[in-house]
Amino acid sequence: MYTINGLGVAIATPFDDALDIDYKAFERLLDFLVGRDFEASAGEYAQSAFADESVRESFQRFWVRESGGVQFVVVLGSTGEGATVESMERRELVRKAVGRKLGIPVVVGTGSNSTKVAVRLTEEAVDLGADAVLVVVPYYNKPTPVGLVAHYRAVAAAAGGKPVIVYNVPGRTGLNLVPSVLKQLWEIENIAAVKESSGI
């Protein structure tokens, strides 16, 4: 099992003009983030995006110099449209990320304001090969501290021993995790980390 540490990137989910997921662009972005096929990927993108040859060459040099080197990727987080993509699309994105054999952990966003849905998404992600899951604090419903702990216990059990990263982003959820709740969550064996985005 991978250890989740170092620099991670929440990967964007690219869409085409028809609002369908661009899976090829997603795979190129994954390769870029781990430093794989820089020049080939940069050249392919530059060829289609820039008509001027000097601009293409500058872009390609920048791409190769600035890319790669992350220690884990997060698929289907907030940036990855985790709350908005369809179930089939979620599964395909996880399959693509895991199937890319990046050599680094793939963390999958599986949070929901429904415990039942969060459990199902977590089970699916783990079954598809996710190395860890990122679970946002349930949004909109504003559960009590007891409800929050119960929610995370259920999700952690569904993760089958894989690390669970708690995601505290009160600006999006309307609920801030307080230290007393975090202390209880930390007692759950596979709660491994907190992504803290409260701004405090």
What are these regions (language model features)?
Residues M1-N176:
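Active-site beta->alpha loop and helix N-cap motifs at the rims of alpha/beta catalytic domains
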